[in-house]
Every structure is written in structure tokens, then in C-alpha cells.
Amino acid sequence: MYGYGYRYNSGLVVGAGGGGGDSYLVDDYAPYIAYDLRKISSTATNSIRVRRLSDNNELDIGFSGDALDESALTTFCSGTDGFVTTFYDQSGNSLDAVMATASSQPRICLNGVIDSVNGKPAILGDGVNDSLRKTGLTGSRPNTQIVLYDKIGTSGYFGAFVFNNITCFSLGATGSRIYQNGAAFGPYSTLNTQALLMFKSTELTTSDWKFYENGSEITNSGEAIGTFTYNNISLFDRPTNASRCNMYMQSYIMFNSDESTTNRLAIQDNINAYYTIY
């Protein structure tokens, strides 16, 4: 049991639902966007769509229980590489992140072996030309973004964008930091390994944002984040085909809200309990 009265099992939040019984993270917290390589919604049927290199055929990959269906993925990609064409949105808003250009699709299998971090499947962006994107969005502050990643490279941007008026994550030599409205905010997070990052923005005042790494707040430098809007999500680069990220990604979740402390802790613990990050 956790201190918040919940017990976590995969994407389930047990006893957290208003009517009692088992429910999923998305069912209880209603994010705007929810990409994850596990089942986090009771209505989700697929996590990713994969193209195999050998013949360019594609297949939707769903779940085995609440985990990614690794058997279906390895069977489909037996002896060849697999690339993600679609990261399905489990929020119910149908905001799937896609990449139609074969050479720009991030990898999920190498010669039939699933790419993984800490024993769980992970999507690999090569830092050269890979991306997954969703355009045509409408969003502004307040906002909460959560990402589970494992960085390899030391530069690049990913997150929510509208040209340079952005609120995104910026990779650095050590960890990552927030980049907003053309300015880099300090300080960096500390880890170059698998990490769960959360960025929350609230009102238009100084110190109106918070940044967390593996459940602990990183004290910011007091910058006022200012007004922002976004109209697209780009998971491994800027939407201008620049600033690519060499990293693994397992989850990206966004709320058009400033999630409460109670929700933040519950969501972080849910993700950590499945992926065993810290």
C-alpha cells in the first residue's frame, strides 16, 4: 500500500475510482493526451503501430494483460527491425502521434529484439531524423507534462510547440531542463539514465512553474514563464525537423491543467510502480 490509500498494478489504480474497484490511470485523471507502452485506459486496444523493415508491412500492437504484447511484436518483427509509425493516444481524444516518412520513424525492434529500458519496451529516437508528432492541437496554460525517458544524447528538444513559442524539455550534457518562449530555464535535472520528469505551469507570475525528477522537485531559478500556447506535440525533436533527440521514450502524458499535489503524487507513483524507475 502507498501513503495515498492506493495500490498500483501496471496501469491500474486500485480503489482510486469514485465508484470503488479497479480503474486505470486515464479513467481517473482524464489527461488531454496519453501515450504509453502499457495499457493505461480501460478502453484502449492498441499502444503502437509498427512497420517492419523486411517488407514494410504494418501491424497494430496491443496489450497482453496490461503490458505491451511483446509476443505479437517479436513474432511480427522476427529477424528484422521494427519502427513505430503511430503512438496511439489512450486518452480517448484520438490525438495519435504519427510519422509517415519511413526514414524518420523511431525504432522499437532491432533484428527481432525489442528495444528496452530497465526490462520494459522503449521507443528509440536516433537523434538524426526520427520523430512522432501530432498537429492541430489547441492548448495553453495551465499545463502539466509528464515524460518517462532515458537520454543518450546531450542536445535536442521535445514536447509541446507552436514555432518558437514553446514549453518543452531540452536535453543537456547532464539531464534536461525546461525551454519556454525562446528561453532556457534553469536548472537542469540531474540524471542521464531512465528518469520520470514532470513540468507544471500555473499562473502568470514569477516562480509560477514547477519541475520534478523522479518525484523530487528541482528548485527553479524564479523565471516568469509568461504566456504560452501550443498547437502540436513533437516527441523527439522540434516540429521544424531540427534539434533531434537521441533517447528512449516509454510514456508521454499531458494535462491542460495544473494537476494537484495529490494527483501528481498518485500519477508519479503509478508510473514508477510499473516501470520501477526509482
Where are these regions (language model features)?
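Extracellular glycan-interaction surfaces
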Residues: C77-T80, T85-N129, G136-G139, Q145-I225
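GGW-centered surface loops in extracellular recognition modules
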Residues: Y2-P106, S116, A122, I146, ...
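Repetitive beta-architecture junctions, highlighting loop-to-beta-strand starts
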Residues: N46, S176, S207-W209, M247-Q250
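Short acidic (Asp/Glu) and glycine-rich catalytic loops that position anionic groups and cofactors
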Residues: G3, K210-E217, N246-S251
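Residues that form or flank phosphate/diphosphate-binding pockets in enzymes
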Residues: L132, R244, T262
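Extracellular glycan-interaction patches encoded by glycine-rich segments
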Residues: F185, S221, T227-Q250, M254, ...
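Short, surface-exposed linear segments at secondary-structure transitions and domain or protein termini
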Residues: D66-S78, S176-Y179, T227-I233
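Short, flexible beta-strand-to-coil junctions
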Residues: M1, N9, K39-T45, R49-E58, ...
